[in-house]
């Protein structure tokens, strides 16, 4: 099991390779990354048998930026018939697993395999259970089978608490009909990724205040309003009437890069299409000056050297807060609903909850 297999957004295979090679260098795991363009996956081949396991044990999955899912294991060729027997034979060296996910890569070819996986899962699950290879126990490793075709599968293992929370890392979020734009799903997914669900009532409560920079027509404002927050929407464009009718939104025609609230707020969110360095500077200003407690900001990516640019910006942000003596937690992820961008979440660790004005 010396291969680490990772899912990603199509077109970002190179970024996954760069990021995982960085990780391997830090953890002193020898090997090499490889991927083909637009295949929505990448691999890191370790030269030592325990290399993939050391990579996974040495890194929290939710702190990786570009991989959507990961698993350590091996590729297996399958016959046209009796695939289950071949899989069971190969799994003889695997530990007993506590859950089973069948996955495909996020390409058109991968999506065509979804129906096959749905039909194949029940008999496979039954066979694994009868063979003693699958029990219902979240403390045990998760068995991840990624089908590249009906004749090739990656047999992988991952800890349930150190891998994606959804199969393939793709959330099952429903677009709310009353939301003014589909961008609303980006912020909802960000909350799922960066904030533990049992902390939502505390950190996304109805007595909070928020600012949405570049808000129009209100996709991200909608998420704040849905949690009951009072929101100041900053944009020279029009906001959706449905949001203004809630009485929870104040719309100010102003520049999102120069606006500052008179009183600190709990949340600042921003999805302005601008150079990433400029949006990153907003994070430094708002968190560093105590204008907000938490923030979600999207950084649009350049065409080339995307991982290097993200890493450079994150390092600069971190150094800026260290220079100010401000304690923050910093998270960054290319979410499923992101396109040529990544989403950053920052939280001040030394500021009390803002008073609602």
UniProtKB/Swiss-Prot annotation:
Give Gene Ontology CC terms. Answer: cytoplasm
State which Enzyme Commission number(s) the record gives.
Answer: 2.1.1.186
Instruction: Please write the reaction equations for the catalytic activity of this protein.
Output: cytidine(2498) in 23S rRNA + S-adenosyl-L-methionine = 2'-O-methylcytidine(2498) in 23S rRNA + S-adenosyl-L-homocysteine + H(+)
Q: Which UniProt keywords apply?
A: Cytoplasm, Methyltransferase, rRNA processing, S-adenosyl-L-methionine, Transferase
Q: Where does S-adenosyl-L-methionine bind?
A: 183, 216-219, 235, 255, 271
The source's domain of life comes to Bacteria
Mind telling me what this protein is named? Ribosomal RNA large subunit methyltransferase M
Explain the purpose of this protein.
Catalyzes the 2'-O-methylation at nucleotide C2498 in 23S rRNA.
Query: NCBIfam families, alphabetically?
Result: PRK11760.1
Q: How does it assemble?
A: Monomer.
Q: Which HAMAP family match?
A: 23SrRNA_methyltr_M
Q: Name one GO biological process term.
A: rRNA processing
Question: Could you tell me one molecular function GO term of this UniProt entry?
Answer: S-adenosylmethionine-dependent methyltransferase activity
The UniProt record lists the keyword Transferase = yes
- Is Heme among this UniProt entry's keywords? no
InterPro entries under this entry?
RlmM_FDX, RlmM_THUMP-like, RNA_MeTrfase_FtsJ_dom, rRNA_MeTrfase_M, SAM-dependent_MTases_sf
Where in the sequence is the active site? 300 (proton acceptor)
Q: Which family does it belong to?
A: Belongs to the class I-like SAM-binding methyltransferase superfamily. RNA methyltransferase RlmE family. RlmM subfamily.
Where is this chain's protein located in or outside the cell?
A: Cytoplasm
Give the enzyme class: transferase
